[in-house]
């Protein structure tokens, strides 16, 4: 069944039909399509456009179609142009003439705009739950590792001592912002396009506010042309998904590096690793690598939709059909990555001794040694030069700063006293950094309390 054709004298070329059809992918939102149709006919009856008997028969028919699709007794037929024509055709076959009234006061343009918003809204809720699960794992690691010392890095070189708790807190903040972005998008997109028609509304006395309420939207959209041609919310969503993937990719890169024999900071669980077909010793971080690799796929969806929309005049154009596969794939990709990544870090083992030893051997306490001199009256620029010379001496001797005797230290600067060793211990270096946002135990405990409160007060998107 076609939803059009009265003015045509020839059948559609089969290649044209195949090229034009979207049912192979828009069947994904059959639930949302039926939900929107039920709200539409409920409103039509309220407005006296349909009677209650017609409304009830249509709703029963639509519910039956949904139930049959879900049970597998009705298979979505790819010979139809789209999911809208499939549902309407099967409705008419079940309830006959009354089914032809379903589309009264509606265009496929506002119908598909509604379906995409309903689908996207549902998926944002799922994405939010997955992000919250990841945040819980990060929160658990933060609580457990407030005194797990490790080097912090700049330029991928050891810089200053921090804790694993502090490092995980950085990712907690990133993924918290990702949740905030999804929440912002949800609020901005939560307007109902149903009733906008093809582009100029309809002559029927529709109650758009009523259908918006039935479908849990905050209000109807305010302009009918914008309603059917707006894809901003999808671009925003793809941008937010790209940012989530960027954060996952950065984290994956660190896990891949930390998992190497050269670092040995972490060991990925067997359940989240794979082997080699030729090298029996290999245990590869494939999940982290695939998450990193799939980031470009999501970026590509964003750029594709931006490019599709950039030259389109108002209002609807068939180009917009390209939004669906891009969005569906990006959402599914991010959901899969979030789920797997959360499981991977939940089961990952951290090698505390190796991390601590790496911080000691990397001169991460050099800044604190310079601060020691400053606190004893040496100008910072001079202290910087003295400690640089001290580090060079340690490199030549293949030792850490702490390994030098007091005599050796005083040969470089007489300002050094016995208390230097306590001043540059990893514990002291970290504990002195107790300002807001720092790695010190007290500072981190405050952060952990705040994170617990955040997770408790933000159970789901709203």
Curated annotation (Swiss-Prot):
Q: Which gene encodes it?
A: argH
Protein's UniProt name:
Argininosuccinate lyase
State whether keyword Repeat applies: no
Q: Which HAMAP family match?
A: Arg_succ_lyase (MF_00006)
Task: Specify the domain of life of the species encoding this protein.
Answer: Bacteria
Q: Does the keyword Lyase apply?
A: yes
Gene Ontology biological process terms from the UniProt entry: arginine biosynthetic process via ornithine; L-arginine biosynthetic process
Q: Which reaction does it catalyse?
A: 2-(N(omega)-L-arginino)succinate = fumarate + L-arginine
Look at the named UniProt entry and state the broad enzyme category this protein falls under.
lyase
UniProt xrefs under NCBIfam families: argH (TIGR00838)
